[in-house]
Amino acid sequence: RVVNRTGAVIATFFMLITPDMLGFSSLSGTNVIHAVTASLGVIYLAVWFRYRERKDLYLASLLLALNIWTRTEGIVFIGAALCVVGYDSFRRKQYKDLLPVLLSLSPALLWSLFMKLNGLYAEGIAIVRLFWDGEKVETIYNYMKNLYVNNYYYGWSFSAALLSLLVNIRNVIKTRDNLRLLSMILLASLFYVIILYQIDYKWDTIENVLAYSAKRFLFCFVPCVWFFTVTNKIVMTG
């Protein structure tokens, strides 16, 4: 529906051979499963923005709900979706479009209710006050920068997306081509960095979390950036 066959083949092929993602596909962890639900939730929202078919909005919201059910950090994708869909809904005065995305938070709310009713408590690791730690910021920046440019982990995923953005920047500015999808990707990335910053690392070092957990979390962005790459106007029209 969105991209021609050649673009679909190219994006699917390079996504499937993403080195580190391919390696983790053989394990029983939740990383790749989470990547599937999170990325498809974002992608179907991008499809909904193009065609405005309600089924795409509902499917996107369901996938985002599964995403946060799989891993708590998935809230960053719901947060990004709420920002973009919320802005679009208020601009068009179609407020009901925001409801399905809001409902995607229900698994987290139900889990919190279940824990409270059963007297289950987890030690809080979030720092809920505002603070500044320059060393922590520098550590997060350096590790995340190195992850995004690491072709051994993610193949050409982020490099191709950046190139696609640069050659299509005129359409992005003038006609907002793929701007909503780009906004969701960037906002989710920003929210994840904020979470990394606001965590009190009692059980492990921040370096280990960035080197291993964050590395696997970025799997979620691989399908999103390939979809962005092959659906840009200048790429589709040659």
Q: Could you describe each region identified by the protein language model?
A:
Residues 40, 81, 157-166, 221-231:
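Hydrophobic cores of alpha-helical transmembrane segments in multi-pass inner/ER membrane proteins
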Residues 26-34:
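Short acidic/glycine- and proline-prone juxtamembrane loop motifs at membrane-interface regions
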Residues 41-57, 236:
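Membrane-interface transmembrane helices that cradle and orient dolichyl/undecaprenyl
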Residues 79-83, 87-170, 185-196:
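Membrane-lumen/periplasm interface segments of specific transmembrane helices
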Residues 11-16, 57-72, 80-82, 105-106, ...:
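Membrane-interface alpha helices of multi-pass inner-membrane proteins
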Residues 7-11, 56, 96-101, 175-186:
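Membrane-interfacial loop-to-transmembrane alpha-helix junctions, especially the N-terminal start
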Residues 1-8, 47-50, 232-235:
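Transmembrane alpha-helical segments of multipass membrane enzymes and assembly factors
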